[in-house]
């Protein structure tokens, strides 16, 4: 589960 930190490049859902 990714939050705002993973918005775009670091998308690790």
Swiss-Prot record:
Domain of life: Eukaryota
Chief location: secreted
A GO MF term: toxin activity
Expression tissues: Expressed by the venom gland.
UniProt entry keywords in alphabetical sequence: Secreted, Toxin
GO CC terms in record: extracellular region
Cell compartment(s), UniProt: Secreted
The keyword DNA-binding is assigned to this record: no
Name of the protein this chain belongs to: Toxin OcyKTx3
Taxonomic source organism: Opisthacanthus cayaporum (South American scorpion)
């Amino acid at each position: 589960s990714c939050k705002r930190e993973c918005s775009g490049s670091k998308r690790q859902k």
